[in-house]
Amino acid sequence: FTGALYSEKLRGLMTEYGVPLTVENDQTRFGKQQPMVGFFKAAGEAALPITMTFDMGNWCWTGEDPIQAAGLLAEHVGYVHVKAAVPQGTSYRAIALDDAGPGWQSLLHRLPAAVPRGIEFPLEGDDLIAVTRHYVTLLRNV
């Protein structure tokens, strides 16, 4: 977020198309905490009904603490991309929650419980239906 919100243009497009707008913290410098905080502050001041897609794993790529990000941004979260990541070379890669430590659960508890959660990591195994059911059940019970 560079400071230019174009609130009337956004409001017009949201009204014209009748779809909700959610903004995700991506893996670039624009997905860091301060640009996201600035964006949602400006959106709130403009009374724009924009929510956040909180991608739990993308904070690895930006080098920021996801727990701190949750504290700063949880009130804006309307959707959660559930993802854990581990270092790979000079970057990161998404991993299954069973292969991650317990930190993802602690992070998820700091985010709104009533918003949709999407699995955003590779589902792998011989029985993908069973694997999918496993993770859906796991996320329902966190």
Please annotate each region the language model reported:
Residues 128-142:
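C-terminal helical cap(s) of enzyme catalytic domains, especially alpha/beta-barrels
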Residues 33, 58-116, 122-126, 130:
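Gly/Pro-rich active-site loop or hairpin
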Residues 7-18, 39-48, 68-78, 105-114, ...:
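Acidic (Asp/Glu)-rich catalytic clusters
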Residues 1-52, 61:
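Active-site acidic/histidine proton-transfer and metal-coordination neighborhood
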Residues 21, 55, 80, 117, ...:
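Conserved, mostly hydrophobic/aromatic
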